[in-house]
Amino acid sequence: MASIRTIIAEKVQEHLNRANWKEAITEMERLFAIHQDPLIRVRIGDVRRKLNRKDEAIQEYLLAADLFAERGFVVKALAQYRLALRLDPTNADIRSRMERLRLNCPVEKLKREPVEYRPPEPITDAILLY
């Protein structure tokens, strides 16, 4: 039996596939109430952008950035701040949040997020030289 989280996520995907943006936002809000994943806020911001609700999208991106920062994902938080800043380049609040995050975090901590290692794929179309 599927979990309630999975069921709601499937409903979200159905609404997104049909371009039912408002219904998708409603379901994503329900999903966020169950599981406070910052990526859900990012997706809500994306949908709000599609609806030309720039100010609401910025607020979603800022909320996601704050959640990422609280959890220690500084690089992801900075990326969300940059996304919000792209929508409103003159917003001093966003700039100050970014600067505070940078100042409170040493360079080593900015690079702490795990990077998935994948070994290089073998070259299959190489020509052997003798």
Residue ranges of model-derived segments:
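Repeat-based scaffolding regions
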Residues: 1-130
